[in-house]
A protein has these predicted regions:
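A short, solvent-exposed beta-edge/loop patch
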Residues: 97-130
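Short, solvent-exposed recognition patches
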Residues: 25-102
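Sec-dependent N-terminal signal peptides
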Residues: 1-3
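Bacterial signal peptide processing site
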Residues: 13-15
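C-terminal motif of bacterial Sec signal peptides marking the signal peptidase cleavage site
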Residues: 8-11
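Extracytoplasmic/secreted proteins, especially bacterial periplasmic and envelope-associated proteins
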Residues: 17, 21, 25, 88, ...
Length: 130
């Protein structure tokens, strides 16, 4: 029993440290962080366990046909409470991207353990630290 509790605690600590590192990297890059109750990806979830749902946004300046414009890009970071929730969320991200985004939007999804990210590739790269 002690081993199970220790393993659970270690897992929670790793996720917590990972969450702090992700938030720090995004903030250092000029992105904003907000905690959400739901996301476009998780709004249909029933019976799944989510710990934190984070929406990160950052304004990018783009030049199209000589005109500069500001575009706000976003990244959703979903901390799942168990493997079944992470599996469901990973599939929900893929479905969301297929239904709502095109290749030109440059949105991707990524999963690490029980953390699932879905959003603009540059923000996701910052969050993943590469």
């Amino acid at each position: 029993m002690v081993c199970v509790l220790l393993a659970s605690l270690t897992s929670c600590m790793k996720i917590g440290m990972k969450q702090n590192a992700i938030e720090s990297r995004l903030k250092e890059s000029g992105a904003t962080i907000s905690y959400e109750r739901t996301t476009p990806i998780t709004k249909e979830a029933k019976g799944y366990v989510f710990e934190d749902l984070i929406r990160s946004t950052k304004v990018y300046t783009r030049t199209v046909d000589g005109q500069e414009s500001e575009v706000t890009e976003e990244l959703f970071i979903i901390f799942c409470g168990n493997d079944a929730t992470a599996d469901w969320t990973e599939n929900a991200c893929k479905t969301y991207l297929a239904d709502n985004k095109s290749d030109s939007d440059k949105w991707i999804s990524y999963r690490y353990d029980r953390i699932v990210m879905c959003g603009y590739y540059e923000l996701l790269s910052i969050a993943r630290n590469y």
